[in-house]
Amino acid sequence: MDENKRKALGAALSQIEKQFGKGSVMRMGDVAAVRDIDVIPTGSLALDIALGCGGLPRGRIVEIYGPESSGKTTLTLEVIAQAQKTGGVAAFVDAEHALDPVYAEKIGVNLDDLLVSQPDTGEQALEIADVLVRSGGVDVVVIDSVAALTPKAELEGEMGDSHMGLQARLMSQALRKLTANIKRSNTLVIFINQIRMKIGVMFGNPETTTGGNALKFYASVRLDIRRSGAIKNGDEVIGNETRVKVVKNKVAPPFRTADFEILYGEGISREGELIDLGVNHDIVQKSGSWYSYGGDRIGQGKDNVRIYLKEHPEVAAAIEAAVREKALAGFQHAPSAERAALEESGF
C-alpha cells in the first residue's frame, strides 16, 4: 500500500476508534477479530458436513423451511438438545402453540432448562425474542413459525378483512432491530417457516416462503428440508428418510445436500448416519453385507450394525470424530495476500 494511503487510513481508524470506541473497526487478521466460526451442531452429522463448518453458526440468523411434517421442528429440537449438552441455554418461542414436550424430551431436550413462550401476537413474539437475545444469556432462540406471527392489527380486525403486507413489514422491522443484537450476543436465532404456492407461475419454482423477502436477505443460512421416503419395519412405517438442501450459506459453499433418517419418537438416527458416512469416508469397511471397523467385524446388515453402535457408544464416538476430522479438515479462513503483506510490514 502507498505510504500516503497508509497514513490516511491510520488517521481514519484512529478517528473511528476515538468516536465509537476501541474495536469499532478491526482487521480480520487481528487476534481480536474472530475468523473461526463458533457453531452449534445440528444433531445430524451429514448436515454438519453439508453446512461446511460443523453446525449452525452462532451470532447469525438461520431459516429452516419445508412442507408440513417434513422434520422442521424435529431438527430445531435436535439443535436445542445439542446446545444444552454443552451447557447452553435455549428458548423456544412457540407462536404455533403446538410444541409437544413429550416428543421434545424423547429427542433429548432438557425440559427443566428450556425457556418456552407462547405469545398472543407476532409483535409480542418478536419482542420477546429481541429481549432474550439482548440479555446475552441465551445461546439458541427458535421462533416456530414465521407463518404464525400474526400482526396485532390482523387479530383485532374482522374475519375476511384485508391486511396486505402487514406481516412482511413486521418481519422487516424486527429483523433490522434483531441483527446487530444477535451478532453482539453471539446468539443463534432460528426461524422455522412454511411454504406457500405463488399463483399464476408458469415457469420456474412456484414455491415461496411466508413473511416477505426480508428473512431471505438477513438469514446467513437457509435450509430446505423435505421427506424423501418412508422407513418401514415390515408394513409399519417407523420413520422418514429426509433430505436437507443448504440453499443459502454465507459461511461456507452453499447448495450441498444431506440425507438422514428421522425415526418416530426418537428423532434423527445418529447410528444410521455414522454407518453411511463411515463407509463413504473409508473409516468403516463394507464387504458384502458385513461391516468392519478397525479390523474388527461389527455386524452383518445395517440394522445389526445400528444396534451394535447403540450398545457401544465409545465406538460410535470414535467413528464420528474420525468422520468430522476427515470431512471438515478444509474449513479455514485464510488471510488474503494483501493482508499478509500488510501484516509483514507491521501495519
Curated annotation (Swiss-Prot):
Gene3D superfamilies: P-loop containing nucleotide triphosphate hydrolases. ATP binds at G66, P67, E68, S69, S70, G71, K72, T73. The keyword DNA-binding applies. One of its GO terms (molecular function) is ATP binding. One of its GO terms (biological process) is DNA recombination. InterPro entries: AAA+_ATPase, DNA_recomb/repair_RecA, DNA_recomb/repair_RecA_CS, P-loop_NTPase, RecA-like_C, RecA-like_N, RecA_ATP-bd, RecA_C_sf. It comes from the Bacteria. Can catalyze the hydrolysis of ATP in the presence of single-stranded DNA, the ATP-dependent uptake of single-stranded DNA by duplex DNA, and the ATP-dependent hybridization of homologous single-stranded DNAs. It interacts with LexA causing its activation and leading to its autocatalytic cleavage. Belongs to the RecA family. This is Protein RecA. It comes from Methylococcus capsulatus (strain ATCC 33009 / NCIMB 11132 / Bath). The lineage of its organism: Bacteria, Pseudomonadati, Pseudomonadota, Gammaproteobacteria, Methylococcales. The gene is recA.
